[in-house]
């Protein structure tokens, strides 16, 4: 599923991400825009670590989810990677909460590149929240 911006903003807010660990909803929207273009089915393979990033948050199979094929995987969120690509993003959000709790928002390269030190207010502008 490819979310519309405001639809995703409302969904992330309902699932408790707005202000979670001090990270604003606008920052989560910026992160997901640059990681996956709001697409739950996004995947990207990383040849160096032989791992794959999954779903709207591009959660990595080396550390956080189990795809059954990544060498020396940890499965920190105790979730199958395929579950992170479901239209219902509750499991993906739960894992993102765990990641930000353990590592902070800087765990996401796209956030560091595109959102940190930027005005991210436009990501929630015009959305009825």
Swiss-Prot record:
Disulfide bond residue pairs: 6-127, 30-115, 65-81, 77-95
CDD domains in the record: LYZ_C
Domain of life: Eukaryota
Keyword Acetylation: no
Keyword set includes Hydrolase: yes
Cited InterPro entries: Glyco_hydro_22 (IPR001916), Glyco_hydro_22_CS (IPR019799), Glyco_hydro_22_lys (IPR000974), Lysozyme-like_dom_sf (IPR023346)
Gene3D superfamilies in the cross-refs: 1.10.530.10
PANTHER family assigned to the protein according to its UniProt record, in alphabetical order: LYSOZYME C
Note: Lysozyme C is capable of both hydrolysis and transglycosylation; it also shows a slight esterase activity. It acts rapidly on both peptide-substituted and unsubstituted peptidoglycan, and slowly on chitin oligosaccharides.
Role according to the record: Lysozymes have primarily a bacteriolytic function; those in tissues and body fluids are associated with the monocyte-macrophage system and enhance the activity of immunoagents.
UniProt-recorded name of the protein: Lysozyme C-2
Organism: Capra hircus (Goat)
């Amino acid at each position: 599923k490819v979310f519309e911006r405001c639809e995703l903003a409302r969904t992330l807010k309902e699932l408790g991400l707005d202000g979670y660990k001090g990270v604003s909803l606008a920052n989560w929207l910026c992160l997901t825009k640059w990681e996956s273009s709001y697409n739950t089915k996004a995947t990207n393979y990383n040849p160096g670590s032989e791992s794959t990033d999954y779903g709207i948050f591009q959660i990595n199979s080396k550390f956080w989810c189990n795809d059954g094929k990544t060498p020396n995987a940890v499965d920190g969120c105790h979730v199958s990677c395929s579950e992170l690509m479901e239209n219902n993003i509750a499991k993906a959000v739960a894992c993102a909460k765990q990641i930000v709790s353990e590592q902070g928002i800087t765990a996401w390269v796209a956030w560091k590149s595109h959102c940190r030190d930027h005005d991210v207010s436009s990501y929630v502008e015009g959305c009825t929240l």
